[in-house]
UniProtKB/Swiss-Prot annotation:
Residues 11-160 form the Ferritin-like diiron domain. One of its GO terms (molecular function) is ferrous iron binding. Gene3D superfamilies: 1.20.1260.10. The modification N-acetylthreonine is found at T2. The gene is FTH1. GO terms for cellular component: autophagosome; cytoplasm; cytoplasmic vesicle; lysosome. InterPro entries: Ferritin, Ferritin-like, Ferritin-like_diiron, Ferritin-like_SF, Ferritin_CS, Ferritin_DPS_dom. SUPFAM superfamilies: Ferritin-like (SSF47240). This is Ferritin heavy chain. Pfam families: Ferritin. Oligomer of 24 subunits. There are two types of subunits: L (light) chain and H (heavy) chain. The major chain can be light or heavy, depending on the species and tissue type. The functional molecule forms a roughly spherical shell with a diameter of 12 nm and contains a central cavity into which the insoluble mineral iron core is deposited. Interacts with NCOA4; NCOA4 promotes targeting of the iron-binding ferritin complex to autolysosomes following starvation or iron depletion. Keywords: Acetylation, Cytoplasm, Cytoplasmic vesicle, Iron, Iron storage, Lysosome, Metal-binding, Oxidoreductase, Phosphoprotein.
């Protein structure tokens, strides 16, 4: 095994930023893994909420893309990618749509907090490129995602979820089923 040679392209890229990017990559991959678990839970024959499954599968792919974008940045800046083990989701049974949406909301807020801390680190290390990258590619999208999930949680509660199975069915069919046409 060869040791990594020093980068020719590295400039104004602090080691703390490099390490924080590697941690963010892991967090984005973890989020992707959680959403993948949610997707296939809702795809089960005894749950059968196909639009919840599609929604969470889409979220999983987005989180993986976020990780890949950070990997590309790491290479562009002359950093080195060090992947860590991805923690398994805290549960395998997501119980119902409301619970899954609440967990997703909590997850997105955690990812957002980590991005805000990464932005602060980049500011402290006087790295305008990293600040701009995070602002351009992540922060606005996180805020939109948090708002969307918050709206979903509110609407599911208003419809009587989780006590009413009909609420989840209607939400799956009419809200998530029509989301392909919006975005």
């Amino acid at each position: 095994m060869t040791t990594a040679s020093p980068s020719q392209v590295r400039q104004n890229y602090h080691q703390d930023s490099e390490a924080a990017i590697n941690r963010q990559i892991n967090l984005e991959l973890y989020a992707s893994y959680v959403y993948l678990s949610m997707s296939y839970y809702f795809d089960r024959d005894d749950v059968a909420l196909k639009n919840f499954a599609k929604y969470f599968l889409h979220q999983s792919h987005e989180e993986r893309e976020h990780a890949e974008k950070l990997m590309k940045l790491q290479n562009q800046r002359g950093g080195r990618i060090f992947l860590q083990d991805i923690k398994k989701p805290d549960r395998d049974d997501w119980e119902n749509g409301l619970n899954a949406m609440e967990c997703a909301l909590h997850l997105e807020k955690s990812v957002n907090q980590s991005l805000l801390e990464l932005h602060k680190l980049a500011t402290d290390k006087n790295d305008p490129h990293l600040c701009d990258f995070i602002e351009t590619h992540y922060l606005n999208e996180q805020v939109k995602s948090i708002k969307e999930l918050g709206d979903h949680v509110t609407n599911l509660r208003k419809m009587g979820a989780p006590e009413s199975g009909m609420a989840e069915y209607l939400f799956d069919k009419h809200t998530l089923g029509n989301s392909d046409n919006e975005s």
